[in-house]
Amino acid sequence: MKKRTFALALSMIIASGVVLGACGSSSDDKKSGDDKSSKDFTVAMVTDTGGVDDRSFNQSAWEGLQKFGKANDMEKGTDGYNYLQSASEADYKTNLNTAVRSDYDLIYGIGYKLKDAIEEVSKQKPKNQFAIVDDTIDDRDNVVSIGFKDNDGSYLVGVVAGLTTKTNKVGFVGGVKGAVIDRFEAGFTAGVKAVNPNAQIDVQYANDFAKADKGQQIASSMYSSGVDVIFHAAGGTGNGVFAEAKNLKKKDPSRAVWVIGVDRDQWDEGKVTANDGKDYNVTLTSEIKRVDIAVDDLATRTKAGDFPGGTKIEYGLDKDAVGLSEHQDNISKDVLAKVEEYKQKIVDGDIKVPEKP
């Protein structure tokens, strides 16, 4: 009898231990799962040939990804947020496949030049999530297309250029001819002509986004012909436009030479100390494209489980994703008032800005 009672008690203790152990295991597993879900999200971007220090499009995208990473306590690297830099167009597909193998939850292709590579890789890897910035990929559930109304923002800097020029000659330097840069050229030209119908507009292309020397060569030719305001939509090539304007300002501080930057606030790029010992800035304004806002926004949505695959998200004046930069010291109050007037007309639909020259 005692043996039977002891055996029964022992079996109950063992059973209790199993139940408690199971409960403890379930709790620990749940906690482990929660930790994984909150920390395991990873994201990467593949640059075009400009790289993350191009002081333009890629840099703005990287700033947005860094902001997202820091806001979510993530570290730079394969376990958090990262970038893969492309030295040439041949690197696009290679870098995208590297990102896929690293199992990033979201992979950005920065710039329309990556469209073909993303189309191919996303088709081969339907379970991975991609985003193409500045172009459109249709009918692909694992790709989000991010676009900007560049023509609207370019129209506004065209208004600034048309009202600021003293020579009635302005210039546009494009990187590579295509649908995206067409919008910059078309918007800028329309804005200039809206406020200064008699202005002459010199349009030239460098056929590259990463050749500052070519940009400087074009700028030198334009300034020599009497152009006093140049808007560049040329990525790193535009650094050469700034270099030429600063050289001219340094030699002759009284000369009015201006550059309108692109994609991000390029105020710092225009700083120069002239031969008279005084500090100047040749940046008239910049047509900002808040790539950082778009990159941060989509990463945040995707991390929360809201990846809008198969759709295109457009950012424009209504979201302050395009427009003039914050540094406006070199623009008169009258010109800024005109900019606001035309901005409202565009937002209200009273002005339809062209997308093609």
Curated annotation (Swiss-Prot):
The keyword Protease does not apply. GO terms for cellular component: plasma membrane. InterPro entries: BMP_lipoprotein, Peripla_BP_I, PnrA-like. It is a lipid-anchor. It is found in: Cell membrane. A lipid is attached at residue 23 (S-diacylglycerol cysteine). It comes from the Bacteria. Belongs to the BMP lipoprotein family. This is CD4+ T-cell-stimulating antigen. The gene is tcsA.
